[in-house]
């Protein structure tokens, strides 16, 4: 019998908290996608993302407080200690780039913004499903598959960033070049943070095979 099969009910709270965080992450990604589809609602979406970011910070604090108090945990303490901030970092990165879109006064969207957002939503979905699978760890190879998919999405974002920056330098407006280059790089950074979550998920799943 594995340790996961011996967990007391109260120790399942870590999975409940991780579920809340991945739900918030997925919602934040959805708001970002909505923003890049229609920037007229950008400020409302920024506010919604900021609220989710605050909630995620609170969940992260709760996880670490409970970790300090728990004698038995469903995962290794260091695994919980890696996963919680990794998830929080993704939401922080989404919050940052969403506020860049607002603060830089970007009034018109484009296909590149939308494609980045689509990749982020897809990563958020894989993260939510992958973290959900940790609740039993009966299918560690499925968790690994999620991490592989996340990595593939990140690789696509790196290619998108390269082509997007090349296209940027075809414009004659230096201010727009600076603004969009910064935004594109930070959108790719969101996906890099997602990829880090994927690495953590992979490490956890392989440890429990």
What is each of the regions a protein language model found here?
Residues 1-209:
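Cytosolic, long alpha-helical scaffolding segments
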């Amino acid at each position: 019998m594995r340790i996961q099969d011996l967990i007391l009910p109260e120790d399942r709270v870590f999975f409940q908290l991780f579920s809340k965080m991945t739900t918030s992450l997925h919602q934040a990604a959805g708001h970002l996608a909505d923003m890049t589809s229609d920037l007229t609602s950008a400020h409302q979406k920024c506010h919604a993302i900021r609220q989710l970011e605050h909630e995620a910070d609170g969940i992260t604090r709760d996880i670490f407080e409970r970790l300090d108090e728990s004698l038995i945990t469903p995962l290794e303490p260091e695994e919980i200690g890696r996963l919680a901030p990794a998830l929080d970092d993704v939401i922080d990165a989404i919050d940052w780039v969403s506020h860049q879109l607002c603060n830089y006064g970007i009034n018109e969207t484009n296909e590149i913004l939308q494609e980045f957002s689509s990749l982020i939503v897809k990563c958020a979905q894989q993260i939510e499903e992958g973290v959900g699978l940790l609740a039993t760890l009966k299918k560690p190879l499925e968790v690994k598959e999620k991490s592989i998919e996340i990595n593939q999405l990140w690789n696509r974002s790196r290619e998108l960033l390269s082509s997007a920056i090349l296209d940027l330098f075809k414009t004659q407006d230096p201010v727009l070049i600076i603004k969009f280059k910064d935004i594109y790089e930070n959108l790719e950074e969101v996906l890099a943070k997602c990829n880090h979550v994927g690495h953590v998920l992979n490490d956890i799943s392989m440890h429990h095979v």
